[in-house]
Regions:
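A structural "domain/chain start" motif
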Residues: 2, 6, 19-61, 165-171
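Classic N-terminal secretory signal peptides
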Residues: 11-19
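Short secondary-structure boundary/capping segments
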Residues: 29-30, 64, 113, 119
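Short acidic low-complexity segments
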Residues: 60-71
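Surface-exposed short loop/turn segments
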Residues: 74-120, 126-142, 158
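C-terminal/domain-edge helix-coil "capping" segments
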Residues: 135-171
Length: 171
């Protein structure tokens, strides 16, 4: 049996789908890196997660030796720190700002050609703090840093996708 309410929902769904298609929306697929092979030096949690994501989400081959790679992703810095944002009326810390900063660049294997000049990504998260919940707040801090690391990996991959060979000499 035909009902006005059911057909209006179907019409609304069709209009919504047409609007989404018209604006260019599409689900995120594979990240197509502009390199056939990539070397990522280092042995830390950020590098491990970055390698996992590149291997899973692109056709780019990860290599162990920089000489075998079309591109080398080098890190210039990786810093995590915690800054006091506010104090309570009793003079105790009540809020922190967590910061995660990573600097990196992408060159060819010889370092002669720069695909992505030295870049820096800074992520921050605010965290309320209480002396009564020290263990819980330590766990929350670790969780926030892991979350920032995941975000960092995604942002680095987005920048790698946008990288183009350039003829800028390395400083």
């Amino acid at each position: 049996m035909w009902s006005f309410e059911g057909s209006s929902r179907a019409a609304f769904a069709c209009v919504l789908a047409a609007l989404l298609a018209a604006c260019g929306f599409h689900l995120r697929g594979q990240a197509e890196l502009p390199f056939e092979s990539l070397h990522i030096p280092g042995n830390n949690p950020l590098v491990a997660e970055l390698k996992r994501n590149v291997a899973a989400a692109s056709r780019t081959r990860l290599v162990d030796k920089p000489g075998e790679a079309q591109a080398v992703l080098g890190f210039t810095e990786e810093l995590r720190d915690k800054i006091i944002l506010s104090f309570s009326s009793a003079g105790r810390v009540s809020e922190y700002k967590l910061r995660y900063r990573v600097g990196f660049r992408v060159t060819d294997a010889k370092g002669a050609q720069v695909y992505l000049p030295t870049s820096e990504i800074l992520l921050t998260r605010d965290m309320a703090y209480s002396d009564a919940q020290v263990l819980a707040k330590e766990a929350e801090e670790a969780l926030l840093f892991r979350d920032m690391q995941r975000d960092m990996v995604q942002q680095i991959i987005r920048r790698l996708v946008a990288a183009k060979p350039a003829t800028v000499p390395i400083e």
